[in-house]
């Protein structure tokens, strides 16, 4: 035992989590620094980050705390929220998440730490689950094609609107008609999306007002926000006769009993899958859906899972029709959506599979029966029910009693929806019991006696009209009719997760994606009732805890970035970009400079940048990059001068997408400002800056951050995400507003998310991470991320050229290696290397972005030296295999790279390859101790798009 007595502070270990989060320990850091030839961490940082942007002081954040203390503080936030019985409805409902799904999907790192399935061979489990979602949505809506989720119902409606405008070539109108009984938050989002695109939104009664307008599409709510169920067949027929398209926003549970939109003639169906087992989460994250006719499939926004075949001709899943998406088509994409809501879509699909069609119908019939009992009881108590035909919602005329009834409900810890001064709304859900109905009746009866539920049940009548009762079957596929016992569901989920690679098994070195640790303590509070059982439109005095946490998180993010104000409403990075550009646009308009509509974007930018710019009505002008990957200052000056009178903004990622800190970033910002433009710093790479420099201090006017990158929200296999925007003081008045937020700034832009605080349910994750790390820990994490990236670059440089470095030879938090020469030397492609990495148990780095034919590697700070070396060993071994091809040991078409990934079926099948089975499946000896087997061989992408199938294939194909 040492003679030195430790201090009490040392024994308390308040900074212990920092060492849990950061992979390399001090000895490993020293070894890596020695390998780089630098004396210490500060020397490395000074050679990497330009001195002109370094901050001189530490972050103004509380010191680090223990995991137990963070959870205790979070519990205090949660206890300040009030969990009432909520009947507000408006697209959000209480639901019962089956615990087998809660534990084995939402709380399982095998699912929530996975990345978007761009590498399909190692994503077969979640691709199958998402295909189940698409099949379920297609069946329920009666449509031919559904995508793999959108961000929320309001966004889905806005996407459907712009989709109709794209595909409806017969109609040149710029009017979009919205039924007045659509969800209010949907109407707000649609109006906000329409305005910069020059679309006029008309809200009215479609039965009366539609004939008075020339319109290109109509949006109808089914059932309406106040509960009304209407037959829209004739109205849709009339729209079609006018060459207009029809969108129906349909409640997913009601479609088990109601005639589906497709059978009513709708062209597009949208909605929210939240009530299929996903908690309220104070408004999100939830998986919206969009479904349409086959003829419009190439105009669908978002991700689309399709069925293809692998190299052996066996069935395999992949993302289909990717040429629609922003990462390929940029400003010509169908949408700027990148991250969607994969994890929540998977949860909803498993809820559907667990209950099956009969179970879902039983739930729906129970909800409807209880609603009819409530309506009958209200009538017998002397209340007038305004809703004649309904599914789960009624509006009640309360006249002069409105306030009294509403307050009486609150006294009983019941939330009703206040429609207006004379009307209250009640929406029932899966969690409602007969006792709940009795309690509601007592509230509305105002002390008068009410009949008991059993008596009312005998006289209550079905409120769905005969002509709208669903006759068609749905969810007939075996996957929805097999896994109804917990044992079967548990094993199905395990089988699927075993097919995939996620952070629970391996490092995911995706450049520009920041696949860092999602710590268990950070994830724990997400499923607490105090956070997950709060309705987004609950009275503000019931959400004090959430709003205090949100305000504190905004303060933390401001401290980290140097921005004056934040909005946490954007529920994806793409939405943050969109909101930030809208704020810039509104700022210019407020100054009488509304004609500023040119957005300068470097050629190296992420595809969401130009896609977002076109969504706000801006014209994209590309700026060249120089040979070192930096913004070409001469070309920037030229373009800024050419467009000076109309320059709205520059969008620049920092550090650059080429993986370096551009030393001229202050000059870049200055050039744009000199010509009246605003500077948008894309925060995708903030993981290289926290604690070292602040975009709000070196020239940025606005940035979006990716909380699902830098601040530890998991990627979920393609969502959820949060993309908050930080702004300088002059842009603060133009942050997104929302009618449910209480007071909103006069100049606030329209909401860009359906819920006032977006995906609020996952904000505790980022708060917890920042709280446990403190300013000191966050800074150390940034330094370690830079160290890890430079170590990988150093180890790989003798084998692969590192394409870009800073002026002193170092990279930021990621590096790009050039594999293009191999195509010329021996025919090996970047795809071959990516697939071969699967045999080594790794997800490939980012392929062909931002430079075609390259790999961009980002290890993050969470990976240990052992894992970094394991990856480097794999890459070096692959280089030796390439050299063997170059030396003529075997040709590329018969090489391990060409046949990768190797499956267990390959191993036991006929082997006619010039290399051994062991070389194919165990290229390194260490793999024998822990081997990941790809469930499929290399997938044929061309076949999948030419033979597009985006629903579950028949079970005979599983058997084969």
UniProtKB/Swiss-Prot annotation:
Gene Ontology cellular-component terms listed: cytosol; glycine cleavage complex
Which branch of life, at top level? Answer: Bacteria
What Gene3D superfamilies does UniProt report for this protein, alphabetically? Aspartate Aminotransferase, domain 1, Type I PLP-dependent aspartate aminotransferase-like (Major domain)
Is Oxidoreductase among the key words of this record?
yes
UniProt GO BP: glycine decarboxylation via glycine cleavage system
Say yes or no: keyword Kinase present: no
Task: Name it.
Answer: Glycine dehydrogenase (decarboxylating)
> Which enzyme type, at the first EC level?
oxidoreductase
Q: Which Pfam families match?
A: GcvP2_C (PF21478), GDC-P (PF02347)
Query: What Gene Ontology molecular-function terms does this entry list?
Result: glycine binding; glycine dehydrogenase (decarboxylating) activity; pyridoxal phosphate binding
- Its job: The glycine cleavage system catalyzes the degradation of glycine. The P protein binds the alpha-amino group of glycine through its pyridoxal phosphate cofactor; CO(2) is released and the remaining methylamine moiety is then transferred to the lipoamide cofactor of the H protein.
**What is the E.C. number?**
1.4.4.2
């Amino acid at each position: 035992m040492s003679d030195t007595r430790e201090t009490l502070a040392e024994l308390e270990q308040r900074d212990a989590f920092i060492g849990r989060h950061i992979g390399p320990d001090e000895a490993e850091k020293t070894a890596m620094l020695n390998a780089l030839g630098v004396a210490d961490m500060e020397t490395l940082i000074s050679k990497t980050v330009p001195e002109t942007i370094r901050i001189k002081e530490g972050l103004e954040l509380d010191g680090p705390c223990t995991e137990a203390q963070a959870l205790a503080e979070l519990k205090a936030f949660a206890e300040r929220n009030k969990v009432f019985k909520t009947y507000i409805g408006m697209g959000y409902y209480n639901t019962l998440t089956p615990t087998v799904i809660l534990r084995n999907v939402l709380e399982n790192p095998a699912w929530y730490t996975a990345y978007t399935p761009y590498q399909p061979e190692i994503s077969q489990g979640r691709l199958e689950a998402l295909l189940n979602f698409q099949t379920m949505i297609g069946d329920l809506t009666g449509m031919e094609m559904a995508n793999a989720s959108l961000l929320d119902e309001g966004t889905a409606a806005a996407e459907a609107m712009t989709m109709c405008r794209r595909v409806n070539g017969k109609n040149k109108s710029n009017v979009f008609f919205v039924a007045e009984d659509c969800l209010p938050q949907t109407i707000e989002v649609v109006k906000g999306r329409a305005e910069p695109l020059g679309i006029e939104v008309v809200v009215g009664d479609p039965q009366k007002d539609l004939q008075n307008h020339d319109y290109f599409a109509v949006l109808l709510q089914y059932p309406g926000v106040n509960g009304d169920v209407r037959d829209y067949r004739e109205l849709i027929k009339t729209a079609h006769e006018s060459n207009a398209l029809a969108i129906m926003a349909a409640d997913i549970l009601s479609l088990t009993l109601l005639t589906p939109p497709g059978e009513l003639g709708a062209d597009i169906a949208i909605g929210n899958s939240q009530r299929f087992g996903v908690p309220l989460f104070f408004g999100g994250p939830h998986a919206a859906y969009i479904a349409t006719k086959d003829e419009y499939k190439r105009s669908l926004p978002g991700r689309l899972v399709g069925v293809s075949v692998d190299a052996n001709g066996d069935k395999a899943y992949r993302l289909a029709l990717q040429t629609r998406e922003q990462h390929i088509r940029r400003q010509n994409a169908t949408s700027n959506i990148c991250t969607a809501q994969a994890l929540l879509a998977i949860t909803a699909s498993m809820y559907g599979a667990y209950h099956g069609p009969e179970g879902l119908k039983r739930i729906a019939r129970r909800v409807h029966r209880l609603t009819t009992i409530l309506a009958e009881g209200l009538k017998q108590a002397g209340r007038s029910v305004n809703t004649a035909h309904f599914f789960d919602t009624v509006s009640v005329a309360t006249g002069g009693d409105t306030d009294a009834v509403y307050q009486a409900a609150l006294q009983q810890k019941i939330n009703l929806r206040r429609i207006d001064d004379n009307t209250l709304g009640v929406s029932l859900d899966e969690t409602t019991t007969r006792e709940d109905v009795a309690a509601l009746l007592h509230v509305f009866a105002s002390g008068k006696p009410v009949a008991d539920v059993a008596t009312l049940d005998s006289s209550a009548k079905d409120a769905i009209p005969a002509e709208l009762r669903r006759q068609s079957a749905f969810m007939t596929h075996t996957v929805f009719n097999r896994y109804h016992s917990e044992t079967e569901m548990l094993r199905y989920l395990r089988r699927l997760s075993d097919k995939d690679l996620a952070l629970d098994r391996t490092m995911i070195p995706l450049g520009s994606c920041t696949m860092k640790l999602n710590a268990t303590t950070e994830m724990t509070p997400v499923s607490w009732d105090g956070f997950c059982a709060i309705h987004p439109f609950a009275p503000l005095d019931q959400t004090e805890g959430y709003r205090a946490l949100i305000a504190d998180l905004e303060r933390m993010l401001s401290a980290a970035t140097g921005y004056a104000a934040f909005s946490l409403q954007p529920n994806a990075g793409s939405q943050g970009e969109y909101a930030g550009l809208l704020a810039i646009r509104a700022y210019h308009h407020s100054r009488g400079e509304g004609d500023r509509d040119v957005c300068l974007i470097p050629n190296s930018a992420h595809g969401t940048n130009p896609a977002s710019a076109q969504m706000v009505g801006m014209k994209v002008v590309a700026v060249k990059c120089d040979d070192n990957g930096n913004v070409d200052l001469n070309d920037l000056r030229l373009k800024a001068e050419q467009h000076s009178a109309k320059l709205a903004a520059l969008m620049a990622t920092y550090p650059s997408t080429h993986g370096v800190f551009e030393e001229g970033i202050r000059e870049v910002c200055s050039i744009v400002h000199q010509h009246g433009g605003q500077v948008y710093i894309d925060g995708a790479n903030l993981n290289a800056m926290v604690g070292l420099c602040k975009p709000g201090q070196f020239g940025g006017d606005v940035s979006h951050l990716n909380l699902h990158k830098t601040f530890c929200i998991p990627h979920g296999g393609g969502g959820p995400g949060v993309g908050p925007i930080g702004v300088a003081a002059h842009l603060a008045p133009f942050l997104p507003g929302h009618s449910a937020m209480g007071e909103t700034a006069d100049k606030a832009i329209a909401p860009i998310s359906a819920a006032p605080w977006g995906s609020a349910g996952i904000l505790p994750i980022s708060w917890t991470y920042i709280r446990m790390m403190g300013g000191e820990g966050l800074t150390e994490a940034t330094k370690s991320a830079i160290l890890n990236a430079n170590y990988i670059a150093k180890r790989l440089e003798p084998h692969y050229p590192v394409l870009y470095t800073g002026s002193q030879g170092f990279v930021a938090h990621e590096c790009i290696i050039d594999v293009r020469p191999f195509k010329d030397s021996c025919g090996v492609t970047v795809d071959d290397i990516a697939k071969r990495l699967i045999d080594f148990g790794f997800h490939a780095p980012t392929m062909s972005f931002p430079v075609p034919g390259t790999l961009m590697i980002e290890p993050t700070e969470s990976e240990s030296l052992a894992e970094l070396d394991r990856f480097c060993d794999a890459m070096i071994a692959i280089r030796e295999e390439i050299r063997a091809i170059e030396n003529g040991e075997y040709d590329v078409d018969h090489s391990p790279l060409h046949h990768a990934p190797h499956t267990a079926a390959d191993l036991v099948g006929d082997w006619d390859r010039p290399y051994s089975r062991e070389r194919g499946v165990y290229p390194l000896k260490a793999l024998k101790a822990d081997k990941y087997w790809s469930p499929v061989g290399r997938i044929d992408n061309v076949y999948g798009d030419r033979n597009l199938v985006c629903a579950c294939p028949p079970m005979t194909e599983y058997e084969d």
